[in-house]
Regions:
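A generic fold-level signal
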Residues: 5, 43, 72-73
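Active-site-adjacent segment of FAD-dependent monooxygenases/related oxidoreductases
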Residues: 47, 51-109
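Short, cationic motifs built from Arg/Lys/His that form the positively charged side of catalytic pockets
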Residues: 19, 38, 108-109
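A short alpha-helix capping/helix-coil boundary motif
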Residues: 2-3, 33-37, 93-96
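Glycine-rich FAD pyrophosphate-binding loop
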Residues: 13, 24-47
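Beta1/beta-strand and adjacent pyrophosphate-binding region of the FAD-binding site
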Residues: 2-18
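Short alpha-helical segment within the catalytic ATP-binding CA
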Residues: 20-21, 53
Length: 109
């Protein structure tokens, strides 16, 4: 294990999507960042199912939109059921505004 620096401007705990993106954005601004993750490798089980238009714009800000967005599918909406099988929420696909679909689905085999 590498030794940790004695001082950094920003420490981020957790290398999930938010931690990774935050470290990326701060690094592009020239800010020294320490990203700490307890797991040695990413989870191999799919967990995220959608990306919204704000997430797409964030990917665009770091130059990843053209690489990532072709891997998504336009959302047709979602229905959410409780453990008894009762529908408790329904979300439509939403309009495409500001250059990106409101929601896209992430294909995870």
């Amino acid at each position: 294990m590498r030794s940790l620096p004695s001082a950094v401007t920003v420490a981020i705990i957790g290398a999930g999507p938010v931690g990774l993106m935050s470290a990326n954005l701060l690094g592009q601004l020239g800010i020294d960042v320490l990203l700490i993750e307890r797991n040695a490798a990413p989870y191999d089980i799919p967990r995220a199912i959608t990306l919204d238009d704000e997430g797409a714009r964030t990917l665009q800000a770091v130059g990843l939109d053209r690489e990532y967005l072709p891997l998504t599918l336009p959302s047709r909406g979602s229905r959410y059921y409780d453990d008894a099988g009762k529908l408790f929420a329904e979300v439509g696909p939403g309009p495409t505004e500001f250059g990106f679909p409101r929601r896209t689905q992430i294909f995870q085999p």
